[in-house]
């Protein structure tokens, strides 16, 4: 029986410096630490991506077309790199072990390769394998000129991936680079400096709302992992499923949701304006809202994984110029409580990104 071709995004997350690390570290410790790092990376990529297989010091994942929009896929790539760097930092600062495996772990880094194309699934030795020219091309990037030149701390996207994900490379400061491979030819790619984004993220102060300043302070345990919860919380196509009949118009720099994205949410004749002012995928987001009849409001959402669930905490605070009276505050609280209850209900009954 012939296989049915599919199209989607192909991702390879590769640990840089793994061979040197393994050869210089204790064999009883190094594979465990490297495995922990790969598990951290895959945990942030999956969902929206699915793990195809682990390939030594790399993880190969994919997402079929229609599984998640381009912004959510970019969120996953960035979140994986940030989670990897945070895990390295915790190993470096929190361990008292003096073995080489722990001491040398901070020398590891990560590079991510993203391509979009066609593939088929084949059953080999009892396992599903992805195959096709585009799968080969994605793997060729691992040994390309950019990987050899830059070393680590970057994401390399083929032109096909950029087009499929709707990325505006100039607005995301992505450098152009051409690869050339035998039997494939020239491949135009774009490089994202993940290390620079991590540095900027580490230096940026997170927006927060103190409990005593909050006019809304709600927390709920939802039956989904942080990636699914984040998607339903932020995606214009998923928000109406729990926020009600709203029409959302979004404008994003670089075709990616993040700091600077503005949104107009229209319910009936009323429109709420939103601007994202803090964006840490799967962990934290903050918005500045212009709410009809009330004025400027600051809002934050914090997500924390708890087994297979997520603790979602939502806070709103009146910003300077707001005119919220006691009745307004009580109405807002009731609306947010009801919305979060609907979100939990939707997430409890849906087929999540991990199972689609």
Regions found by a protein language model. Name each.
Residues 163-217, 224-227:
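C-terminal tail/extension regions appended to the core domain(s) of diverse proteins
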Residues 240-241, 250-298, 311, 338, ...:
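Glycine-rich portal/gate segments that line the openings of hydrophobic small-molecule binding cavities
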Residues 66-176:
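Catalytic beta-strand-to-alpha-helix segment of the class III nucleotidyl cyclase homology domain
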Residues 33-48, 79-83, 87, 232, ...:
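Generic non-transmembrane alpha-helical segments
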Residues 289-345, 353-356:
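Beta-strand/loop substructures that line and gate deep hydrophobic ligand-binding cavities in soluble
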Residues 204-253:
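Hydrophobic ligand-binding cavity/cleft-lining segments
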Residues 1-75, 79:
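Catalytic NTP-binding/metal-coordinating core of nucleotidyl cyclase/transferase enzymes
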């Amino acid at each position: 029986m012939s296989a049915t071709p599919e199209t989607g995004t192909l991702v390879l997350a590769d640990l840089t410096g793994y061979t040197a690390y393994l050869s210089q570290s204790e064999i009883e410790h190094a594979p465990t630490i490297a495995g922990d790092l790969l598990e951290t990376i895959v945990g942030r990529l999956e969902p929206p991506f699915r793990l195809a297989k682990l390939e030594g010091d790399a993880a190969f994942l994919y997402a079929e077309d229609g599984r998640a929009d381009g912004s959510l896929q970019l969120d996953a790539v960035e979140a994986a790199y940030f989670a990897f760097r945070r895990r390295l930092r915790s190993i470096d600062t929190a361990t008292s072990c003096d073995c080489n495996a722990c001491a040398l772990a901070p020398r590891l880094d990560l590079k991510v390769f993203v391509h979009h194309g066609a593939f088929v699934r084949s059953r080999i030795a009892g396992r599903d394998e992805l195959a096709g020219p585009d799968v080969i091309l994605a793997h060729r990037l691992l040994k390309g000129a950019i990987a050899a030149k830059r070393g680590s701390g970057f994401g390399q996207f083929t032109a096909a991936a950029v087009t499929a994900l709707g990325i505006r490379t100039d607005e995301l400061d992505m450098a152009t680079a051409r690869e050339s491979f035998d039997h494939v030819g020239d491949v135009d790619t774009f490089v994202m400096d993940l290390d620079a984004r991590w540095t900027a993220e580490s230096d940026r102060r997170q927006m927060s709302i103190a409990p005593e300043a909050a006019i809304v302070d709600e927390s709920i345990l939802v039956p989904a992992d942080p990636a699914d919860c984040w998607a339903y919380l932020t995606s214009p196509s998923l928000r109406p499923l729990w926020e009600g009949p709203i029409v959302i118009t979004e404008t994003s720099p670089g075709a990616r949701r993040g700091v600077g994205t503005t949104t107009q949410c229209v319910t009936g004749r009323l429109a709420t304006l939103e601007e994202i002012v803090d964006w840490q995928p799967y962990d934290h987001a903050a918005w500045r809202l212009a709410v009809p009849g009330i004025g400027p409001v600051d809002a934050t959402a914090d997500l924390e994984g708890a087994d297979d669930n997520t603790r979602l905490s939502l806070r709103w605070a009146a910003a300077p110029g707001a005119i919220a009276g006691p009745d307004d505050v009580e109405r807002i609280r009731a609306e947010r409580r009801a919305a979060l209850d609907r979100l939990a209900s939707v997430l409890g009954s849906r087929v999540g990104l991990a199972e689609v």
